[in-house]
Amino acid sequence: MKEFIISEVKTETAILVGLITKEQDEAKTKEYLDELEFLADTAGATTVKRFTQRVNGPSAVTYVGKGKLEDIREYIKLKEDEDDPIGMVIFDDELSAKQMRNIEQELGVKILDRTSLILDIFAMRAQTANAKTQVELAQYRYMLPRLQRLWTHLERQGGGSGSGGGKGSVEIGRASC
């Protein structure tokens, strides 16, 4: 008699974050978060909590206010010692590179926005070489404008004595894309 090996697929645990604004009421935000939860599930993540905040508009620095970001951080710390710690926070909007970097530094987990989540799903599902190439191109197009903000912590790399100023980190990143 054969024995079957049962293996568990390890999924990441996620938190969803959305804003309630004048343009997007609470019902619409709930609908968008329901859709985002479905997308997260499709990508292999398990949603355990939703955070919403009523604001006039997103914060340019961290998308949500400092108090809400603190609430999210406290929840992540609370779940650290459990079997399934929080692995990512998914925002129901497109984040700037500055927002992503600031939020990631504050929370210490992977940060995704709706666009990057959708691109990840397409990358997972792409079958043909052509489809994989198209998804990769879309991911690069998405990343390219964010390179400048991602590498603000790095200085220009010198070109050496007599060989000019050298290339900046953004230029090196663009070349690699």
Regions found by a protein language model. Give the residues of each.
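N-terminal accessory targeting/assembly segments
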Residues: M1-R114, I118-D120
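Canonical P-loop GTPase G-domain recognition
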Residues: E106-G168
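Active-site-proximal binding-pocket segments
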Residues: E171
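Conserved small/polar residues in nucleotide/adenosyl-binding loops
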Residues: A175-C177
